[in-house]
């Protein structure tokens, strides 16, 4: 039943296109476009085939022979004479003069072989040029008659359509919505960095790697992937609320795009407000010359976003400080032991690295760190 309705809708939509008059107009317009393309290509070919008259030169280099990195012997023809010249980096010396009557056998044989090789290519080029000139006239004649006999067709650009919803609001058509969606994808990295828990997590992971003394393990790709999936895990309640409150009504055409964006921003605002420190919010409010707010939901994004970022940076550095303390103690102990033993030339990081890794594994560091990060967010 669904297939029959689908094919019936397709036939109904295509029936106006294949109407006799409209179909003739479409075909005539298509023929005009093809004719313009052919004429334009022919004009370009003619323009590109124009050759600039070269300056007549009485001197011609016949052959060149390199005898070193910067030395060569050149055979030059000047009027009726052929000169053999020796060319170096500093000077040019005359070696011998050949009269024009004495033909160089080597050059003649070379020219003969080149003429034999290029004979077939030249014939093909001549054939293509003549065939183009002969057939181009016969190609243009039918299109001239077609243009003179066919009626003119005009194509109108489809306008940007909109739909009226049940509540009286207005929504744009699907192509416009698709364009807006694809444009919004360019802001996805900024959204991920400035409005989620990704900033705090990735900074803590980077500080952990520096505290361990392993700048290349784990690699950046592993840390970014772990931070990304942990961000989705922490933000999943917020994303689910955005999906239910904003996306589902918008997909069912119960809400327009503007209301959906406002409705979807409310859970993100609530998440960011729970992480923002009061001094940071007061600082940016003071810089924006805003004294007070009636409600937390009235705080604009231009104040909320920088306050959230600065709060996240401060929290991430505090967590990183607590991570550095045990590893710093290990470095100090190892350095003191090496100094006491007189091993001045041994770098302490080489000795302390195994102890740091052993400590991190014994306390189950990854589980402890991820658990602490997940509980550090006030959701």
Curated annotation (Swiss-Prot):
Q: Which domain of life is it from?
A: Bacteria
One GO process term, biological-process aspect: protein secretion
Q: Which keywords, in A-to-Z order, does the entry hold?
A: Bacterial flagellum, Bacterial flagellum biogenesis, Bacterial flagellum protein export, Cell membrane, Membrane, Protein transport, Transmembrane, Transmembrane helix, Transport
Q: Which cysteines in this chain are paired by disulphide bridges?
A: none
Q: Where in the cell is it found?
A: Cell membrane; Bacterial flagellum basal body
Might you report a single GO cellular component term? plasma membrane
Q: How does it sit in the membrane?
A: Multi-pass membrane protein
**Is this entry keyworded Isomerase?**
no
Give the protein's biological function. Plays a role in the flagellum-specific transport system.
What family does the entry list? Belongs to the FliP/MopC/SpaP family.
Q: Which NCBIfam families match?
A: FliO_TIGR, fliP, PRK12797.1
- Protein's name according to its UniProt entry: Flagellar biosynthetic protein FliP
Q: Which organism is it from?
A: Buchnera aphidicola subsp. Acyrthosiphon pisum (strain APS) (Acyrthosiphon pisum symbiotic bacterium)
Q: Which gene encodes it?
A: fliP
């Amino acid at each position: 039943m669904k297939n029959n309705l689908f094919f019936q809708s397709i036939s109904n939509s295509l029936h106006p296109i294949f109407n006799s008059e409209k179909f003739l107009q479409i075909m005539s317009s298509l023929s005009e476009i093809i004719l313009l393309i052919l004429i334009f290509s022919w004009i370009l070919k003619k323009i590109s085939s124009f050759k600039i008259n070269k300056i007549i030169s009485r001197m011609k280099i016949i052959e060149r022979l390199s005898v070193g990195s910067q030395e060569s012997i050149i055979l030059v023809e000047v009027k009726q004479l052929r000169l053999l010249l020796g060319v170096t980096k500093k000077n040019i010396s005359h070696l011998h003069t050949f009269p024009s009557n004495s033909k160089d056998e080597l050059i003649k044989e070379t020219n003969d072989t080149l003429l034999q090789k290029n004979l077939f290519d030249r014939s093909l080029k001549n054939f293509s040029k003549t065939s183009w000139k002969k057939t181009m006239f016969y190609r243009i004649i039918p299109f001239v008659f077609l243009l003179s006999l066919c009626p003119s067709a005009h194509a109108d650009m489809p306008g940007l359509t909109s739909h009226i919803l049940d509540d009286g609001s207005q929504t744009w058509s699907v192509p416009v919505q698709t364009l807006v969606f694809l444009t919004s994808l360019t802001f996805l990295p900024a959204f991920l960095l400035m409005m989620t828990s990704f900033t705090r997590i990735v900074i803590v992971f980077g500080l952990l790697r520096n505290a361990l003394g392993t700048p290349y393990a784990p690699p950046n790709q592993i840390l970014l992937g772990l931070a990304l999936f942990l961000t989705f895990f922490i933000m999943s309640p917020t994303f689910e609320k955005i999906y239910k409150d904003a996306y589902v009504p918008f997909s069912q055409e119960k809400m327009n795009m503007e209301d959906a964006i406002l409705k979807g921003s409310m859970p993100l605002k609530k998440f960011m407000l729970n992480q923002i420190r009061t001094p940071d919010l007061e600082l940016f409010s003071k810089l924006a010359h805003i004294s007070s707010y009636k409600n937390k939901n009235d705080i604009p994004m231009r104040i909320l976003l920088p306050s959230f970022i600065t709060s996240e940076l401060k929290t991430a550095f505090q967590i990183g400080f607590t991570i550095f303390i045990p590893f710093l103690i290990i470095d100090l102990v190892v350095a003191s032991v090496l100094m006491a033993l007189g091993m001045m030339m041994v770098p302490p990081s080489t000795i302390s690295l195994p102890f740091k890794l052993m400590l991190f594994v014994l306390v189950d560091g990854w589980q402890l760190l991820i658990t602490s990060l997940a509980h550090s967010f006030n959701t």
